[in-house]
A protein has these predicted regions:
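Active-site loop immediately N-terminal to the catalytic Tyr-X3-Lys motif
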Residues: 96, 152, 194-195, 240
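Short, well-ordered secondary-structure micro-motifs
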Residues: 44, 140, 192, 224, ...
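N-terminal Rossmann-like NAD(P)+-binding domain of SDR-like oxidoreductases, especially those catalyzing
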Residues: 1-187, 227, 256, 320-323
Length: 328
């Protein structure tokens, strides 16, 4: 079946990998990449696709109602994969209004335009909303976030994504819009903007700059390689059940300080430096306000229903990622 797929945020980190997979693997689809090209988005991530016949880039803002209406009408959009978002927690603490505008109002605008354009003819239509595990709040030493976990966001970023999730579900319950939501753990891999933990650490090691460690470095995150996340998005898009939520986790729990030490070891090695050279760059700083202690995802629903599983080669994927940043 042919689809005209609108992918929002397709010039960003995860979005660029999603766009590449869909353009490459589904030549029968027309892929429309909508991105405002903020500081974190770059068409350099997709230069190899610019001449593909089934790929079109559109520069624009998801909050612009008339603009989005024109896109749906001009390109006859039948499916949406919505990744466009402000996503950096520290920035959300400084400027929560921008996060509410993009993540909440932008999502609401897309939902409303999709509802109006599809006019209750929902056959083969889908609004697939990509979200985060941060909406669930924080875990203690034990347990996992499941699709039934209650929402308990602690940062303005998490609150904005939680609100957008609720709006997506409300359009299913109120208007019967065919929606799917997935919530994923922390991603890493090529193309990630350098404000995020892994590329920040690697770049600071490369340039001999201080490596900031929040608090005591004991906070725990569940890391997933971006290719694994994109494989899950592909499966959910094609085989997921509308109205459902799927959690996507990498099953790679690690304390921040342990991850940073691994990045130091790997980066120093790939740069030809003596082991432990960059340990001296560690700098413990005041903890982030509302810093969640631990995230960990239960992906069993996705595993059991759609046959997905994360890769087992975490260290190899870390090495791939570090190598990519060294070459930039």
């Amino acid at each position: 079946m042919n689809h005209n797929v609108l992918i929002t945020g397709g010039a960003g980190f995860i979005g660029s990998h999603v766009v590449r997979l869909f353009v490459t693997n589904y030549p029968q689809y027309q892929i429309y990449n909508l991105d405002v090209l903020s500081y974190a988005g770059s068409l350099d991530n997709l230069t190899d696709l610019k001449n593909n016949e089934n790929y079109t880039f559109i520069k624009g803002d998801i909050c612009d109602n008339e603009f989005i209406k024109n896109i749906f009408k001009k390109y006859k959009i039948s499916r949406v994969i919505h990744l466009a978002a402000e996503s950096h927690v520290d920035r959300s603490i400084v400027d929560p209004f921008s996060f509410a505008q993009t993540n909440v109002m932008g999502t609401l605008n897309l939902l409303q335009v999709a509802k109006e354009y599809w006019q209750n003819n929902y056959v083969n239509k889908l609004f697939y909303h990509i979200s985060t595990d941060e909406v669930y709040g924080s875990l203690g030493q034990d347990g996992l976030f499941s699709v039934n976990s209650k929402y308990d966001p602690h940062s303005p970023y998490a609150a904005s994504k939680a609100s957008s999730d609720h709006f997506v579900r409300s359009y299913k319950d109120t208007y019967d819009l065919p929606i799917i939501i997935s919530n994923c753990s922390n991603n890493f891999g090529p193309n990630q903007f350098t404000e995020k933990l892994i590329p920040l650490v690697v770049n600071n090691i490369i340039h001999n700059k201080p490596i900031p460690v929040y608090g005591n470095g004991e906070n725990i995150r569940d890391w997933i390689f971006v290719d694994d996340h994109v494989r899950a998005i592909d499966l959910i898009f094609h085989k997921g059940e509308t109205g459902e939520t799927y959690n996507i986790g990498g099953s790679n729990e690690m304390r921040n300080i342990d991850l940073i030490n691994e990045l130091i070891t790997t980066t120093d090695s790939l740069l030809g430096r003596p082991e432990g050279t960059s340990i001296k760059l560690l700098k413990y700083v005041t903890d982030r306000p509302g810093h969640d202690f631990r995230y960990a995802i239960d992906s069993s629903k996705l595993n059991n229903q759609l046959g997905w599983k994360s890769s087992d080669n975490f260290i190899e994927n870390i090495e791939k990622t570090v190598s990519w940043y060294i070459k930039q």
